[in-house]
Amino acid sequence: GRARQFKTNGYTFDMGPSWYWMPDVFDRFFEDFNKKSSDLYEIKKLDPGYKVFFKNNESVLISSDVNKITETFENIEKGSGSKLRKFLEQAKDNYELAVKDMLYKMPGFSILELINTKTILKFNLFLTNINKQVNGLFRNEKLRSILKFPVLFLGAKPSNTPAFYNFMNYADFGLGTWQPKNGFYDVVKSMIMIAKEQGVKFNKNSNVDKINI
């Protein structure tokens, strides 16, 4: 969501994103400008990461420790612990390919950039979707729901999202859920500062007459 801050009657409210995922991506962004995110704002890893609520007042607590998450899965569905570990190994591999080899190295001018030796080896993951992959591994509906929801942050449905995007599950369970100590607006202020250092000028509450590309 859009990171905003609302102040009223002496109170300050953090508005927008619920949590801070993929801290390595933020770190890389600031490093591009010779900055360290840790020098600009402080983040704290949440433990537990979050709790998922279901009907009938049932809930599942998601720990910040992947080993504990595996135990939680195993307690809910026998045999699911080992399946989750293998699933996350694949998700981590996909994450490193998507972020390190694709996001940072490809200019994004053509879809043909996505075709290389590594992506060809994962071609089968583009032929099925998150929904089918998760349902094929896990029987319990709660576990299925937990594993399917991260792709919603991509603005997509599990049934329409290629299984390659299970790297979002690694972002969730592997990298964990974080929160900026003073709210997300600290991240916004840091980005504004960098933009201004690069010569960007911000015109607020102004009409847009033209978009130059």
Spans of model-derived segments:
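N-terminal glycine-rich phosphate/pyrophosphate-binding loop and immediately adjacent elements
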Residues: 1-96
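Rossmann-like flavin
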Residues: 55-161
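Alpha-helix capping and helix-loop boundary segments enriched in small/acidic/polar residues
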Residues: 17, 159, 178-182
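Helical element adjacent to the flavin cofactor pocket in flavoenzyme catalytic cores
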Residues: 125-126, 135, 166-212
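Active-site phosphate/pyrophosphate- and oxyanion-stabilizing loops and adjacent acidic/basic residues
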Residues: 27, 132, 189
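Flexible loop/turn segments at secondary-structure boundaries
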Residues: 1, 154-155, 210-211
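Active-site substrate-recognition segment that forms the wall
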Residues: 39, 158-161, 193-194, 210
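General beta-strand structural signal in soluble alpha/beta enzymes
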Residues: 15, 145-147, 204
